[in-house]
Structure formats: C-alpha cells, structure tokens
Amino acid sequence: MNIREWPAEERPREKLLQRGAVVLTDAELLAVLLGSGVAGRNVLDLARGLLVRFGGLRQFLEAEREAVLREPGIGMVKYAQLQALLEIGRRYLDENIKRAAALDGPAAVRRYLKAMLRHEVSEVFGCLFLDSKHRPLAFEILFRGTIDRASVYPREVVRRALLHNAAALILCHNHPSGSSEPSQDDVHLTLSLKRGLALIDVRVLDHIIIGDGEPLSMVEHGWIVA
C-alpha cells in the first residue's frame, strides 16, 4: 500500500508533527529524512531495509559513502543531506557543551565525547580544553590516522592548550575496532602528555577512549591518576 493511503496518524511525517519526533522509531525518523520510496517499496519499508542491512541507524549514517550510494533510493543529493544532518547534530551538541556553565560530571563528558567521535571510521585524537573552573573552552580533533593508529605530537597538544589559555584538559581518542580497552601505547602516551602539560601548569583530568560500548575513563579504571 502506498504510504499516502495510510491513516494520517500512522504516516511518519504526520506522526512527527502531531506527537513529536521522540515517539518515532528509527525507521520512521529515517523515512522522514528520505522523503520517498522506490518502485515497489514505500519509504518506510525502504528505511527498515536500510537499517537491517547496515545494522542500525548509527551504522547507516556513519557508513562509507560508496556503500550508501549503492542502495536504491539513495543518490548523491540524499547522501549529502544525511551527512549535513549528522554534522548539524554534532555542532548542536558542541554548542550546548560550550554554553554550559560547568561540566556536570564525568558521565556528561563521556556522552559528549562519544557523540563527537563515534562517527569516525579512522582513529582520531582530540582534546576538550577547560578553564580553571573546568568550564569548556573548546573541543578540537588534533590528529587523524588510520583504522588503528593516529600519530600524536605532544608539542602540538601543548601549543593548542596555550592558544586556548586552558588550565586543564581531557584527552580522548576512538578505537574504530570497537574495544575501549587502552593499549600500553595509550597509557605511555597519556603519561607523556601529562608530564609535558604539567610544565605549563595544565592538568590532564582524564583520557577517554571511545569504542562500541560505553566510553572508558582511564582515570576511573586506574590506568592514570588525575
């Protein structure tokens, strides 16, 4: 059945307008973004199929461009719109955290950093720069690497901390392989950065690792001392 023939309260777009986006399923939200289906498949069936094949909404939005463009109903324009939406979401979250009077706890920091890094398909390393009251000054991805490694240069981290006049910072990087467990290289790098930043009176409060599950705090797990 064509989706236009459905009762209004069951159509994703009308449902969103009447009841709010929060009540929609992932497939319904994606259907609203896609706008239309393809021959023989309405837009909701198309959205459901995409989520099944890619393994979920996050996996679909973060998939390689070539893989997405192979799907029926997804052209370059639609792909660009989806990527723009993803970036808008990240920037909205980034703006919210910058406006915060202070970080309200480690859990909020982990949620924020996960949202900023989880889409990356290669390993990246970033810093959340903080003032003396641990209020956010800026977040930057400083280094990008391959699927399993990003080269980090302590001198550049120090330079960016000075540029932002930071009193403290939180290091972060992702593990695209999925595991959040720190490697020995991760631990050694963190200790090296702590020593270097201490020379300019900048504290390293934590190093957060983003994998497939919950973000890992190296401080909370005893790998380093804040």
Swiss-Prot record:
Record-annotated MPN domain positions:
102-224
GO BP annotations, alphabetical order: proteolysis
Arranged from A to Z, the UniProt key words for this protein are: Hydrolase, Metal-binding, Metalloprotease, Protease, Zinc
Where does this chain carry the motif JAMM motif?
173-186
Which InterPro entries does UniProt cross-reference here?
A: MPN, RadC_JAB, RuvA_2-like, UPF0758, UPF0758_CS, UPF0758_N
- Positions binding Zn(2+) in this chain are 173, 175, 186
Q: Which Gene3D superfamilies match?
A: Cytidine Deaminase, domain 2
Which family does this protein fall into? Belongs to the UPF0758 family.
- Under which name does UniProt file this protein? UPF0758 protein PputGB1_5335
The species this protein was found in:
Pseudomonas putida (strain GB-1)
Q: Which lineage do the record's taxonomy fields give for this organism? A: Bacteria, Pseudomonadati, Pseudomonadota, Gammaproteobacteria, Pseudomonadales
